[in-house]
Amino acid sequence: MAILHVDEIRDMTAAEREVELEQLETELLNEKAVLAAGGAPENPGRIGELKRTIARVKTIQREEGDFDE
């Protein structure tokens, strides 16, 4: 999954953002599971990228008023 930029996130509909957020959170969970199992991640910087992208999506959801949590 590609890391999203702010313009790409803003162009999405609220439903698309929700689906993308769910996919990103699942991917982050999988990366953390690899670390917890004692494995080495393929790309160590990926976890930070995922966290930042999730934060971007949530920030834009708040700005747009479509945040569900």
Swiss-Prot record:
InterPro entries: Ribosomal_uL29 (IPR001854), Ribosomal_uL29_CS (IPR018254), Ribosomal_uL29_sf (IPR036049). One of its GO terms (molecular function) is structural constituent of ribosome. The keyword Transferase does not apply. Belongs to the universal ribosomal protein uL29 family. Pfam families: Ribosomal_L29 (PF00831). GO terms for cellular component: ribonucleoprotein complex; ribosome. Keywords: Ribonucleoprotein, Ribosomal protein. This is Large ribosomal subunit protein uL29. It comes from the Archaea. GO terms for biological process: translation.
